[in-house]
A protein has these predicted regions:
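Well-ordered beta-strand positions enriched in small/hydrophobic/aromatic, beta-favoring residues
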Residues: 90-91, 119, 129
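Repetitive helical segments and hydrophobic/amphipathic motifs
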Residues: 15-16
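Residues that line or immediately flank small-molecule/substrate-binding pockets and catalytic motifs
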Residues: 12, 95, 123
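Bacterial N-terminal signal peptides that target proteins for export
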Residues: 1-12
Length: 130
């Protein structure tokens, strides 16, 4: 029993030494790029810049808002899909970029289910088909 306790105590001691080093990594430690798939001055651009300012204030890091308009938003979303999935490149997406483009384009350059993970919901819009 005493031998078993020594091994258990040793394992716990090693784990306690490892955990603080894993937790020491900080995020973010460099600027965050926020891609907007619409033109400058659009509602999405204004919202993303407002969110970017708040995110910068909370994290203490700069948030660079980059407009990548064109091709119904596929240019920005394809760039996001190619980016390293480390949280330093995020995008302002809509139902157009996440749903409609997948149905409209044969090869949009991204798969919204596999390539992206939601962070937050900014707002909602009701659509009506007439």
């Amino acid at each position: 029993m005493q031998k078993h306790f020594k091994h258990l105590f040793s394992a716990i001691t090693i784990m306690m030494a490892i955990v603080p080093s894993a937790m020491a990594q900080t995020y973010p430690n460099r600027p965050i790029k926020l891609l907007v798939p619409l033109a400058a001055g659009s509602t999405a651009d204004i919202l993303s810049r407002t969110i970017g300012q708040e995110l910068a204030a909370i994290t203490g890091q700069a948030v660079v808002v980059e407009n990548k308009a064109g091709a119904g938003g596929t240019i920005a979303m394809a760039e996001l899909a190619r980016a390293t999935p480390d949280g330093y490149t995020i995008a302002f997406a809509s139902q157009g970029t996440l749903v409609f483009n997948i149905a409209l384009y044969a090869k949009p350059g991204y798969d919204p289910v596999k390539d992206f993970a939601p962070i937050m919901l900014v707002g909602g819009v009701s659509n009506v088909m007439i």
